[in-house]
């Protein structure tokens, strides 16, 4: 694609706002909001950290082509849980909790709504390209919007619009105005004074609608994952021929991305690790896991225990009970090693018979 002339980009990203309006209209008819509204609320919970709900909307188009691709990604606490891809023209639920809460029916409705959006998008993208009068090439409209629930109960929202990978507009919640990112012509500024979306509607979505649906999601997620049972803690002990002993504490079936594992010696903390969203590991079934290890002198194992603090749970596991688990793991490893050593012999016999 040829380099641009360097002139300020004259386009109307308000077109993308029309797309978002189709996606984020009131919960009765909305695909995304309808999905969140369908999740049943079984009580509320006290927030222990900041939670986020984020929508990424991207529209791709080749100038001169009627083909337009729409990709909608929805994240909760930075985890992707719903995706619509214009190539497959289907909505895909991500995460076991969705499949357990009518995910298939939800996806069918999502797909039907987003197909209609994609049809409208073709004409909208053509309008943007014509207004820009740029040279041929791939162009992208993108939007990032959503909200945060803070641990103190307050909320804040965000809404950014961009074109070809660069931010163009940002909504300011304090002044309830749209600000143009980067240099812009007076013509562009005047255009937004006339055509920008109504600030009161944007404010309602960021302040009320988005946080309410995020609250519903968090409540449903918590209740759904608690059905899998309480968290579990195991302690293993690995002995080495010479040197120290490694004790490893593992926590499973965690239903949020926050936990604290503490090693205690004779009941007193000696090592503590707090896991947050960026350090805890997903288990692949909608729950999370974490582990922490400590090295001790041989014979000190009975002095140590591991404590998990997770939500309302506090679980203690002693190091002595981990020997059995480690022994069984060693047996399994030995069996695997034996099978592996026998494999070349089996292959040799099979090849000899084949010849």
UniProtKB/Swiss-Prot annotation:
Residues 230-323 are annotated as: Alpha-3. Changing residue 244 to A: Fails to bind to heparan sulfate or to NIH-3T3 fibroblast cells. The keyword Disulfide bond applies. Pfam families: C1-set, MHC_I. Residues 1-29 form the signal peptide. N-glycosylated. The keyword Glycoprotein applies. Residues 46-137 are annotated as: Alpha-1. It is a lipid-anchor; GPI-anchor. One of its GO terms (cellular component) is external side of plasma membrane. Disulfide bonds join 96-107, 147-210, 249-306. It comes from the Eukaryota. Ubiquitously expressed in neonatal and adult tissues. A lipid is attached at residue 330 (GPI-anchor amidated aspartate). Its main location: membrane. Changing residue 238 to A: Fails to bind to heparan sulfate or to NIH-3T3 fibroblast cells. Residues 324-329 are annotated as: Connecting peptide. Binds to heparan sulfate proteoglycans on the surface of fibroblast (NIH-3T3) cells. Heterodimer with B2M (beta-2-microglobulin). This is MHC class I-like protein MILL2. It comes from Mus musculus.
